[in-house]
């Protein structure tokens, strides 16, 4: 069956968006708020009608992820910020495979996410309460699967409990995107053998987004 590279690219951009937000948080203590909302909201939507619907139904919601994806696909340097983004992206893919193969882990994750939906009736998505709850899901369900993702950045920034919670919640969103990526036919071999196809698709999507003013 022919691969749907549009859906694969969107899901891959979702992983990369989480990677970029984690990087911003770790270095600066804050990140693109709109992109963060899109990524966190993707965790909550358990029954989306399409791949794009996971990310709010708009390609523009993945602008950060698509731009990051192009950087990761075309990274010539093994050092610096691009290397960090590549490491986070690949690490999320590895953890997703462990999640999918661990007995009962996906069910546990689903049950815990259902609990978030109840909390959303009383608290905002980006409230400290929800951030802490999503971070706890990451720590309880994802982290034990190993290997842990080593987040690098400013030590002073990373000491903040609020930043730690946001980073873990954002990594959980990355896992959500990685699960979606496999569901729509994504696989790590594509990063080696279909790099040009993915690059072209990402550029096409970005090309018809309205430019940021």
Curated annotation (Swiss-Prot):
Primary subcellular site in the record, as a coarse category: cytoplasm
Ranges in coiled-coil conformation: 79-126
UniProtKB keywords: Cell inner membrane, Cell membrane, Coiled coil, Cytoplasm, Membrane
Null allele phenotype: Cells lacking this gene show an increased lysogenization frequency.
GO cellular component term, pick one: cytoplasm
Gene3D superfamilies according to UniProt: HflD-like (1.10.3890.10)
Compartmental location: Cytoplasm; Cell inner membrane
Job description of the protein: Negative regulator of phage lambda lysogenization. Contributes to the degradation of the phage regulatory protein CII. Acts probably by holding CII on the membrane surface, away from the target promoters, but close to the FtsH protease.
Family of this protein: Belongs to the HflD family.
PANTHER family (alphabetical): HIGH FREQUENCY LYSOGENIZATION PROTEIN HFLD (PTHR38100:SF1)
Designated name of the protein: High frequency lysogenization protein HflD
Species per Swiss-Prot/TrEMBL record: Escherichia coli (strain K12)
Lineage, top ranks: Bacteria, Pseudomonadati, Pseudomonadota, Gammaproteobacteria, Enterobacterales
Gene coding for it: hflD
């Amino acid at each position: 069956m022919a691969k749907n590279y549009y859906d694969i690219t969107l899901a891959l951009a979702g992983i990369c968006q989480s990677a970029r937000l984690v990087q911003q948080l770790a270095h600066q203590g804050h990140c693109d708020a709109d992109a963060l909302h899109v990524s966190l909201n993707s965790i909550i939507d358990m029954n989306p009608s399409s791949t794009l619907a996971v990310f709010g139904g708009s390609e523009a919601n993945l602008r950060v992820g698509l731009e990051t994806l192009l950087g990761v696909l075309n990274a010539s340097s093994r050092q610096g910020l691009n290397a960090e983004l590549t490491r986070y992206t690949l690490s999320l893919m590895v953890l997703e495979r462990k999640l999918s193969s661990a007995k009962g882990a996906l069910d546990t994750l689903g049950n815990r996410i259902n609990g978030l939906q109840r909390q959303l009736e009383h608290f905002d998505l980006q409230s400290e309460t929800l951030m802490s709850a999503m971070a706890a899901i990451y720590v309880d369900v994802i982290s034990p699967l190993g290997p842990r993702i080593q987040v690098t950045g400013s030590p002073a920034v990373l000491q903040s409990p609020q930043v730690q919670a946001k980073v873990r919640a954002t990594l959980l969103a990355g896992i959500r995107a990685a699960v979606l990526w496999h569901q729509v036919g994504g696989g790590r071999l594509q990063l080696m053998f279909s790099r040009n196809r993915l690059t072209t698709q990402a550029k096409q999507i970005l090309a018809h987004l309205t430019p940021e003013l």
